[in-house]
């Protein structure tokens, strides 16, 4: 069967994303879910990557299959922009001591840095299982905080504004 290669790209402000849990039901009439979380299972590389919005190409380009995401940082999904930046050692752990105290200046405060400081593209490449070929598919996000544009294979699918809509 033909394998379909897809890329999902999300531009988010103050990101909090949760992808659907990986559950395959035994009932043939039940809906199937494929997890897009960043935690791999069974040796698969389920990684997301991220790049500052202003430093990346257009949504059409970065969401296209075959796009080379060189220089992108690993991202944690579900998580936040700050969570992924801490993971990549860009900023110190905010819950250690008083690292997150605004007066220390270790972690930029959105009030000082501006909302655009936390605008990032999040990207993931995945294959749709052959058992789902020809079927109507849904991308379900369990929480985007606060705004996102969703792209798939070079096409903008839509935008969201407001938590958990």
How should each PLM-predicted stretch be described?
Residues 1-25:
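Bacterial Sec-dependent N-terminal signal peptides
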Residues 71-110:
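Aromatic- and Gly/Pro-rich amphipathic surface segment
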